[in-house]
Amino acid sequence: MTDRDHTTVTDARGPVNTGPGDQYVIYAATNRLIRRRAESLRISRDDRLHLADRFVPPARYRIAADLLEEPGSVVLVNGRPGSGRRAAAIMLLHRFGEDRNIDEEGVRVEELPVTGKDRDAGSDEDEVPPGRGDRFLLDLSGITDEAEYGEARRRLARHRAQVQEAGAHMVVVLPWAVRHDHPPELAQHTVTLGRPRGLAVLTRYLRMDGMPFRAADLASTDLQRLCEQSAVRELVRLAGLVRDARDSGRFGDGFSAWLGQALHAVTNRADEVQRQVAAVRDTPERALFLAAALFEEMHADIVYAAWQRLMGTVRHEEEATSELGRTDFGARLKVLGIGRDADGRLRFERLAYADAVRTYFWANFPGVRDDLRDWIDTSSELRGLTTDERVDVVVRFCERSLAAGRPDHLFDLAARWADRAPGAQCDPRAVAALELGLGHERLGGWFRRRMYEYVRSSALSDGLARVLTVVCRRSLAATHPDQAVVRLRYLAVRETEASQEAKEALLELASRDRRLYRLLIDRLRPGAGRDTNRGNPHLDLLTALLGSDRAPDPPRWPDLFLGWEAVFAQPPTELWHPLAGSWLSAVADDGTPEMALEVMVGATHGRAAALHRLYVIAYGWAGPTPSASRAAVANRFWQHIDHARYARTPVTEQSGAGPRTMEEAR
């Protein structure tokens, strides 16, 4: 198994409570991720179902679907940027299983790494070979460099051979920029997809949002031109803006008004913001412009406080006159086109204007990005902000920082907030920042590598460890479960106050999936024989994992044998009692096969100390007056123990006389 870079797309996306303690549900961040699906790698089953309801097949889609039919098939899809290539590839994999009513339990639906640079530095993990029926996506569409494409082609050849041998299925999205260099030997497996009809895409999304419209409402020349020329993701954004205009209640009460506002937002906003910033020359007005864009829909007093902090962060000193002698706050807002509702909340008068303002400042004032990071650090803590509002501000900042290629700003802030969290609390701002980073299509690998480096560091604080635990459990486990296991394992064996939360999350995650269960056994076995000043956390964790309540159903005996073998190779401890007792109870009460008794005893390799302790455990488990079922199970267990002890004794082999059984010795 491997700590490799791939995306699992089988698990549902949502909050999961994996044990005792608080559950951190970041609704604002989650909702915003749902609104920005095109930028996220989180294509869980729920997300695929969402896309399937809205998907419009492009030209030649059926040809690609037919090529994917046979076990071991690899289909390469080509197409111009903006034609919806990635969405089509995801739907090919999704509908392959849907059309056949395939149960995805135990089937891998994963995104593979593009190049080796996205793997953990120094990772010694081996890639997991695919199984029959597994489905894989390899998206090479972002490659523009021929050297990088050369490496990607070598990885493609290796993946293709594995897929064919296993009878799995793979869809590859080819890069358009280097289309002249596509492998000729795969031409017969390559399909060049057309662009879906833009108007059909827009119509499908509008209908799924419950929009009341007629065909005549979509007949304008501007809209028709947009549908013919724009990338599919821009049409999806347009439909989302129509929904936002409707839901806001501020832009008319009919579809035509909502569509007009949305069209204006996607075609003219950038130029409007540029002209307005050029007209506003002084620092206070520009700072207020940006503060209102980050804190839009929040109370005016909060925006005012954030504005003042921003001017302090950029080291601007106001004029010496008192505030009563300056332009009042309301007048400044009016000049900037910012309205104040009856409840005191501030909003830009035009649809999607705040987003355009944020985009403009991050793109055109790169010298203040570090200052903006420090400003958000403290401004997101302003008194009066609700938790959802704090997270919303952080999400807006993170979106712009990621677009500007500054993932380090997100991680720096997450670490600061995590370290300042009181007691054992987990700051939701830190969780939201890291979740957004992990879900970013281009920079998600950077965050996974950074997390890997941090969990291995002895300098990791308890606060950040708690945040990383939550992020692994909530987010990374849904997209890269094997990487989540590796990181949680490092967190769980740290022997700190925060490690218990990681342990519970890790055991819960591993017990849900056979692959992950075996992966964790393999990762814990080497450390089972290494004691520390405070015991052996690897051995403790492995023993907890091997209980009957954690094992997959039905149990996979070779995996359990490897785990029990590592445990029973160490001196007996009290942890053996719940481990062995859980399996004895499972055999007696739950119909677990007796194979459990034989495999458990076999894992001792006849070690006398281990066999003796297991005998004593069974004696205590049965009790002085055992029930018939317990007495029968205990007797069969003792028989396996006696057989193991008898079989390994050299004297027995030479003389033919057996040693005393455990029962006789007792």
Language model segments and positions:
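Long, low-complexity intrinsically disordered regions enriched in small/polar
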Residues: 1-43
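N-terminal pre-Walker A segment at the start of P-loop NTPase domains
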Residues: 37-65
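Walker A/P-loop nucleotide-binding motif
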Residues: 72-88
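Amphipathic alpha-helical "lid/sensor" segments that cap RecA-like P-loop NTPase cores
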Residues: 179-183, 203-266
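Extended amphipathic alpha-helical coiled-coil/heptad-repeat regions
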Residues: 386-572
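C-terminal leucine-rich, beta-strand-based interaction scaffolds used for sensing/assembly
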Residues: 271-274, 280, 295-427, 444, ...
